[in-house]
């Protein structure tokens, strides 16, 4: 597998296997989008994520093992309360917005509980759309 300069990590210590599940969904062609609250990005991180549009990126697991490559096709903002349907579908939720929202409430539960994240209808999400690259 070719390793690209740009890197995207799925998973974190204590994620109860979520990162691995997301990587498996990418590999199976079931996941073609990801998102994170804009408030969790630094200015430099925001600049960097927007520059990934059109770029090839290597996906790593939480143990820093390269797992696959993706091509980022678009990066944009949407809100948690009215998410762009490309995000909802790309996350594997079809047209089920409420399911998408509940999945992300659970994924970000620790951040919400610790006060690091306030999640509401107006929370801005940075969205990355991508396709799996076989190389």
Curated annotation (Swiss-Prot):
<protein>
    <recommendedName>
        <fullName>Uncharacterized protein YhfF</fullName>
    </recommendedName>
</protein>
<feature type="domain" description="ASCH">
    <location>
        <begin position="18"/>
        <end position="130"/>
    </location>
</feature>
<dbReference type="InterPro" id="IPR009326">
    <property type="entry name" value="DUF984"/>
</dbReference>
<dbReference type="Pfam" id="PF04266">
    <property type="entry name" value="ASCH"/>
</dbReference>
<dbReference type="InterPro" id="IPR015947">
    <property type="entry name" value="PUA-like_sf"/>
</dbReference>
<dbReference type="InterPro" id="IPR007374">
    <property type="entry name" value="ASCH_domain"/>
</dbReference>
């Amino acid at each position: 597998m070719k390793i690209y300069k740009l890197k995207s990590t799925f998973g974190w210590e204590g994620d109860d296997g979520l990162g691995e599940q997301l990587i498996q969904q990418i590999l199976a062609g079931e996941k073609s989008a990801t998102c994170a609250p804009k408030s969790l990005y630094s200015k430099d991180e925001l600049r960097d994520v927007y520059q990934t549009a059109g770029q090839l990126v290597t996906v790593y697991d939480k143990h820093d093992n390269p797992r696959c490559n993706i091509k980022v096709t678009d990066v944009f903002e949407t809100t948690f309360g009215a998410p762009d349907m490309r995000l909802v579908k790309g996350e594997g939720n079809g047209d089920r917005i409420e399911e998408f929202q509940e999945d992300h409430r659970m994924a970000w539960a620790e951040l919400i509980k610790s006060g690091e994240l306030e999640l509401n209808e107006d929370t801005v999400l940075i969205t990355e759309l991508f396709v799996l690259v076989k190389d």
